[in-house]
Amino acid sequence: MTRASVLTGLGSCLPSRCVTNAELERTMDTSDEWIRARTGIAQRYVAEEGTLTSDLAVGAAERALKSARLTPDEIDAVIVATTTPDRPCPATAPTVAARLGTGPVPAFDVSAVCSGFLYGLATGSGLIASGAAERVLVIGAETFSRILNPQDRSTSVIFGDGAGAVVLRAGEPGETGALGPLRLGSDGTGVDLITVPAGGPPRPGAAAPDDLADRYFTMEGKRVFWLAVQRMGECAESVLDRAGWRVADVDWLVSHQANHRITARLADEIGIPRERSVSNIAEVGNTAAASIPLALDHAHARGTLRPGDRVLLTAFGGGLTWGAAALTWPAVDPV
């Protein structure tokens, strides 16, 4: 019999420093009105000097384990989805696993930018389906502020730092909390649309002058907008079809929190009322791979998500990459 993956715990972690739009007004050519109108963001959290991606990942993981009523030594694998690891090599996940105290279990990173959490979810679910693991910790964690050009208002006003985590356990298909159909995709011809151009062998970061903008994250916003809506919409329709759900059956849409215009347009394209689209972008900004688990945890804490609710997850990120998944919301302990 096919083993399902059931969401049994979740948690999140944000840095202590909150940066409002008013603060950004004092450091760059922008305004609160401009930022809100184009992104829907009012504030974002930024990691203090010395705070690493692994620090946020551990904080979110500890809360997820508490929510699942598990101890670290009961976890069989740790997956960290991130674009901003502690260092280029090795992966951040082994550091997270060691700090949690999981023991010598498999621990590795997944890099798919803003789609990373869904890629991690698919990988964790695959470990459970194959029998290689009974319980998997999947974390999305970012310190995106470290790769942003502080003078580029097209990116610096959008992104924030943070982490979200879920615990998956082996279960039965169809039980409350079970992860349903999941679809992923990519298109490498769009690699330059969302990227940090310098840092790899073709353009080593160490050889770049201090003022080289290519050291920072760049994005072609207008092209990304339409591609994100198109790809997430197509993926969502495929997942709904495979799950046997009608659009009217979906209680909540939880999409990657890119900006409020993308999430609103996506809801319209799928046919889900905008008021059924979960959003926390005003409070935390775009947190890349952390955005979906952060949105889930915050919606759960507010009482928005209730056991048995049918939830549709969608994401789009650099690569280009995208994904969607169906999930029946579980009875999860709040933390």
UniProtKB/Swiss-Prot annotation:
Keywords: Acyltransferase, Cytoplasm, Fatty acid biosynthesis, Fatty acid metabolism, Lipid biosynthesis, Lipid metabolism, Multifunctional enzyme, Transferase
CDD domains: KAS_III (cd00830)
Pathway where it operates: Lipid metabolism; fatty acid biosynthesis
Reaction catalysed by this enzyme: malonyl-[ACP] + acetyl-CoA + H(+) = 3-oxobutanoyl-[ACP] + CO2 + CoA
Record flagged with keyword Lipid metabolism: yes
Annotated protein name in UniProt: Beta-ketoacyl-[acyl-carrier-protein] synthase III 3
Highest rank taxon of the organism: Bacteria
Gene Ontology cellular-component terms listed: cytoplasm
UniProt organism field: Streptomyces coelicolor (strain ATCC BAA-471 / A3(2) / M145)
Location relative to the cell: Cytoplasm
Region annotated ACP-binding, chain positions: 257-261
